[in-house]
Amino acid sequence: EQFVPVLSLTQKNVLSLCAASKTFNLAGLEQAAMLVPDEAVRAKINTEMERAGVRSGNLFALEGTRAAYEYGDAWLDGLMRYLDGNRKHLTALVKQELPQAVLTPMEATYLGWLDLRAYGMNCEELMARTLKHGVQFTEGTFFGEGGEGFLRVNIGCPRRNITEGIHRLKEALDEAVEEKAHGVD
């Protein structure tokens, strides 16, 4: 898929917010940028930011962000290859271990969206069962009512953690299916 920056389409009534935090794992720097081409809009935003006490980032954060953008290409290429391997690994594991589950294809993210509605549990039960088996996901309802029966899976981790997490999820789901088959709640 081709990325089209919004600022390449128009300079009017638009702004762009960006940060190196997700891409380069620099959230601790608490540094972001706002690109506002329209001078009048930029002036209004600057006035409100000053009123709110928002200042530019500290020198360490500015330099860390600059270094990531200027020198981080090789590291980022390696990360992207690793995450692509994790995505493929998760896809294969879900297909093999959780045949009733549906993994939404991941595009431009390291977060998988796993549909477990076929197992007949709501998010509260899913979370209780997965925690009992020592694995935690983000429950789908965190993102709204439409997320009921879904879990979010983070693949930005060592591959062995994905394997372990899916195996524990399988144990939790198998246990639930077994209990329901025997009339145990």
Regions found by a protein language model. Give the residues of each.
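PLP-dependent class I/II
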Residues: 1-185
